[in-house]
A protein has these predicted regions:
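Hydrophobic residues within well-ordered alpha-helices
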Residues: 16-17, 65, 106-107, 147, ...
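Short, Asp-centered acidic motifs that coordinate Mg2+ and/or phosphate
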Residues: 22-23, 112-113, 146
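A ligand-binding cleft/hinge motif common to bilobed small-molecule-binding domains
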Residues: 27-36, 81-84, 107-108, 112-141
């Protein structure tokens, strides 16, 4: 029986190495570094980092955010995107403990923009949500999610086999459609 545990996303690799958790499954962006240091599955879903602002905000590119307050979750792909984007790196970056805090900051006007996962933003902003006054204005880095286990684990291969079976029988496609996701190739 699995036990699902919320952790500090900024220390996810440390938690895994210390055996506090057995895998990282929730929205883990696959990177070369992670694939070198952990046993990772094949990608299962596509994602991107997006810029979220208040409705009515004039935005044409990340250059509009130079000198503005931009938030992202500490240790996330959003944080990496801010650090690596020529314009966003010149923003006043403030890290938050979770992505939903980033949305609260933008909605409250204490941050000008947030950089976070497309999958989360799609589900949490716009008409009919608690953040109806927010909108996505830019899609930045396209990425893929996978599942990570401790280096040397054979569980990643078993999960890959399960993913292959779930793709073949249409289960993953049906779930992706239900939740507005795009499966990785």
């Amino acid at each position: 029986e699995p036990e699902f545990v919320e952790i500090n996303w900024d220390t996810k690799e440390t938690e895994l190495a210390a055996k506090s958790i057995d895998c990282i499954w929730n929205g883990l962006t696959l990177t070369d570094d992670r694939e070198e240091n952990m046993a990772c599955t094949k990608p299962y879903v596509k994602n991107a980092q997006v810029v979220v602002v208040k409705d009515g905000t004039e935005y044409t590119s990340t250059a509009d955010l130079v000198g503005k307050t931009v938030v992202a979750e500490a240790g996330s792909a959003g944080e990496t995107t801010i650090q690596e984007d020529e314009n966003l790196a010149q923003a006043d970056y403030v890290s938050k403990s979770v992505q939903t805090d980033c949305l609260m900051e933008v909605a409250a006007g204490t941050a000008d923009a947030a950089v976070l996962d497309l999958t989360l933003a799609s589900a949490m902003i716009g008409e009919g949500t608690d953040y109806a006054n927010l909108k996505m204005v830019d899609e930045l880095n396209v990425e893929e999610y996978g599942v990570a286990f401790r280096k040397g684990s054979d569980v990643a291969a078993a999960v890959d086999t399960a993913f292959d079976e779930l793709k073949a029988d249409g289960t993953m496609g049906a779930l992706a459609e239900k939740y507005g996701l795009t499966l990785a190739e």
